[in-house]
Amino acid sequence: MKVSIVEPRGVIWEGMSKQVILPAADGQMSVLDLHQPFLVRLKSGRIKTSGIETKIKEGIAFMRANELKIVVEV
């Protein structure tokens, strides 16, 4: 899936990944390739994907058409 992690100042990371781990408001969430569409609120924690780890304060993530877009405050 295509993954974009962005914050107000610009793109943090963009690329292809088979799995992304998100700090969802209701608990840790693992998103795999071809996941069903969703919109989820993120809490303070770490986003992990393709060998990178990004610490965030909060944000939202949405999946559609095998693209995961993550908008965060770091």
State the predicted function of each range.
Residues 2-74:
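Compact, glycine-rich, soluble single-domain proteins
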